[in-house]
A protein has these predicted regions:
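Conserved catalytic segments around the Walker B and adjacent sensor/switch elements
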Residues: 10-12, 29-32
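P-loop NTPase motor domains
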Residues: 17-28, 35, 42-168
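P-loop NTPase nucleotide-binding module
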Residues: 1-13, 17
Length: 168
């Protein structure tokens, strides 16, 4: 109903692959996320088409801080120094993309990990070590540039193939 009465986009997070048939019938895009998938969505993709009041880099930095907080598993949240080293790394990895905004210049998680490691301080190393599972480990399918078109008005992320921990 929303798609018929508004120009809003609809994004579905589907933990049981229940919506795929409907989304396909409506001409939407189904993106299957799993370790075996050939569909990749780069968590570091940045949208430069924000209004003048919004800063895309600040919004992405906030997302990366939340992402790192989740993967580090701290019940008390990130320490102030950890937040600082993450923000510093985010600022650095987007410089090449902003200088030349082509898809191949979009940073990926290994770029973030390298920018953290290059800071040579324990807090940055701790965050980089937490990222290793997503860069070099069994969950490295997040360490790719986006290979699917997510510009469709109706997008369904099929996350059935993800483990229980990732579905959180």
């Amino acid at each position: 109903y929303v798609m018929l009465t508004t120009k809003d986009n609809v994004i579905i997070c589907d933990p049981e692959d229940e919506y795929s048939p409907l989304v396909n019938r409506l001409g939407g895009q189904v993106i299957r996320l799993s370790p075996n998938s050939r569909d990749y969505v780069n968590p570091l993709d940045i949208n430069l088409n924000y209004s003048e009041e919004e800063n895309p880099l600040a919004l992405k930095s906030d997302f990366v801080l939340s992402f790192c907080e989740l993967i580090m598993g701290s019940k008390t949240g990130l320490e102030a120094i950890e937040k600082t080293v993450i923000d510093r790394a985010v600022q650095k990895i987007y410089q090449p993309y902003f200088a030349d905004p082509r898809p191949e210049n979009m940073p990926i998680l290994s770029d973030l990990m390298a920018a953290l490691t290059a800071q040579h301080i324990p807090e940055a190393d701790r965050v980089a070590q937490a990222l290793d599972l997503y860069v070099n480990g069994s969950l490295n399918f997040f360490n790719h540039r986006t290979t699917v078109d997510i510009r469709n008005r109706l997008v369904c992320f099929d996350i059935k193939g993800l483990g229980k921990n990732l579905k959180k």
